[in-house]
Swiss-Prot record:
Name under which the protein is recorded: Bifunctional purine biosynthesis protein PurH
Entries under SUPFAM superfamilies matching the protein: Cytidine deaminase-like (SSF53927), Methylglyoxal synthase-like (SSF52335)
Cited HAMAP family: PurH
Coiled coil stretches, renumbered: none
Domain MGS-like: 1-146
One Gene Ontology term from the biological process aspect of the record: 'de novo' IMP biosynthetic process
Length: 520
């Protein structure tokens, strides 16, 4: 008896070449249902409809098509098992040797802003995953394909094996099939969990492997990058440069989060986008600035600390212009990310073949979701991203002297930066430019010393931001000794009064935000 291939796909790409090869080259009978059968018939291929084979019509508007013993018996039966063979003969069931199924586009459906509950529910596939799981379970005898990108692999292997599907390939395809159905069910569970806001649900996600990286943070560590296509960095387009590394991705993430504080879009002229640039090393910023255009912002960000910028990562929140590209070309950098690059900028930067240029559109960022996930031994920590809007109207003036208009602007700028610096974090800034950044010290005054020393004489007339409260008045007094005129911090220390008193004695303005921004 001729081998049988069952084909039932929502994505018709590559279907006809596969079906033609199975039938005309390898002699397969084609069994199909619904729209897939119609496509095959229109192409002139002989096909038996599932409803004809089972003797049962499609019912419930297509909800039940393939859920039938003649389908699943043919998939699950063990070849060479006498009892199974007898059951098939008694029920007039044929072996099914190849199953080609891809599932209703649930993830794509629920990603639409205007999707309704009923539309989402109707795109939950039932028969498809059931056939995939049956075929994957019986991979000793059955090959299962769930994606068009597997079709050529199957046909090439069959051509080399005289029409047979090698056992190793069947096993690999079974693995991919179970991964596919697991990811599909996870997507449904995630959507429904968010829709009904269930408390205590397990955190589920199935993220496909995008790339095996050269190594991890260090050469002796293996690393892999998992990402959904078109979501977050999975939606970035690398225009040129070497392969991305683990450290590149970590630094890009940090740089992007910070530059988005000032808006992010493909057109730097958009009112919501204040042209800004960020330079990052080891996930900490070494220079951040805003400007009248992205070129000015970039120059100011680099001027904040040109020594540390060497080998850094740059993020820009608007179109990279020719002028900005000229500045970038003069430096040794690892990566530059922006919503887009002008043709002139691309031409200028093409001379730096190893420089990684990435275009990342706002839509890909928005599709990435709100969860921040980190691993710990034997588990995960999942929290909301610390990306709530800055609300100066909710801040409190704690000092006798309120900040001046310029100080207020500088304090807002510094507060946007400090939540992206590793705790304990201190930022010294003035007129839309970071001047000194103190990160990761075990005591707050230690971070303040680093930031103030980096700012040097420029600290005079500048402001200082702290991601956590001042536990003592030492940071305020140190800041004043370097010429700082205003400070901002969350407040909440038992000794807040001491720091406020020091500000009043020394003539500093102090704002309390009421919100801490630790970063570990």
């Amino acid at each position: 008896m001729a081998p049988v291939a069952l084909l039932s796909v929502s994505d018709k790409s590559g279907l006809l070449p596969l079906a033609e090869a199975l039938h005309r080259i390898h002699g397969y009978q084609l069994l199909s249902s619904g729209g897939t059968a119609k496509v095959l018939e229109q192409a002139g291929l002989p096909v038996t409809r599932v409803s004809e084979y089972t003797g049962a019509p499609e019912i419930l508007g297509g909800r039940v098509k393939t859920l039938h013993p003649r389908v699943h018996g043919g998939i699950l039966a063990k070849r060479g098992d006498a009892a199974h063979q007898n059951d098939l003969e008694q029920q007039n069931i044929n072996f099914i040797d190849v199953v080609v199924v891809n599932l209703y586009p649930f993830r794509e459906t629920v990603a639409k802003a205007d999707v309704t509950w009923d539309q989402a529910i109707e795109n939950i596939d039932i028969g498809g995953p059931t056939m995939v799981r049956s075929a994957a379970k019986n991979h000793a005898d059955v090959a299962v394909l769930t994606s068009p990108d597997q079709y050529d692999r199957l046909l090439e292997a069959m051509a080399q094996a005289g029409g047979e599907v090698p056992a190793a390939l069947r096993r690999q395809l079974a693995l991919e099939a179970f991964q596919h159905t697991a990811a599909y069910d996870t997507a449904i569970s995630r959507w429904m969990d968010q829709a009904v806001a269930a408390d205590g649900s397990p955190w589920l996600e199935a993220v496909p492997l995008r790339q095996t990286l050269r190594y991890g943070e260090n050469p002796h560590q293996k690393a892999r990058w998992y990402s959904h296509a078109q979501q977050g960095w999975g939606g970035a387009v690398q225009l040129q440069g070497k392969e991305l590394s683990t450290n590149n991705l970590l630094d890009l993430e940090a740089a992007l989060a910070m530059v988005r504080e000032f808006g992010y879009g493909s057109d730097g002229a958009e009112p919501a986008v204040q042209p800004a640039a960020v330079v990052v090393k080891h996930t900490n910023p070494c220079g951040v600035a805003i400007g009248s255009d992205v070129s000015t912002a970039l120059t100011r960000a680099l001027d904040a600390d040109r020594v540390s910028a060497f080998g850094g990562i740059v993020a820009i929140n608007g179109v990279v212009s020719a002028a900005a590209a000229g500045e970038l070309k003069s430096l040794f950098l690892e990566c530059v990310v922006a919503p887009s690059f002008s043709p002139e900028a691309r031409e200028i930067l093409a001379a730096k073949a190893n420089l990684r240029l990435l275009e990342l559109q706002p839509a890909a960022i928005d599709a990435a979701g709100p969860d921040h996930v980190r691993s710990i031994l034997g588990g995960l920590l999942v929290q909301d991203l610390d990306d709530q809007a800055i609300t100066p109207s909710e801040w409190t003036v704690a000092s006798q002297r309120p900040p001046s208009s310029q100080e207020q602007q500088d304090l807002e700028f510094a507060w946007r930066l400090v939540r992206h610096v590793r705790s304990n974090a201190i930022v010294v800034a003035s007129k839309g430019q970071s001047l000194g950044i103190g990160a990761g010290q075990m005591n707050r005054v230690g971070s303040a010393r680093l930031a103030l020393d980096a700012a040097g004489d420029q600290a005079t007339g500048a402001v200082l931001a702290s991601d956590g409260f001042f536990p003592f008045d030492d940071t305020v007094r140190l800041a004043a000794s370097h010429g700082i005129t205003a400070v901002i911090h969350p407040g909440g220390s038992l000794r807040d009064a001491d720091s406020i008193k020091a500000c009043d004695e020394l003539g500093l303005a102090m704002l309390l935000t009421g919100r801490r921004h630790f970063l570990h």
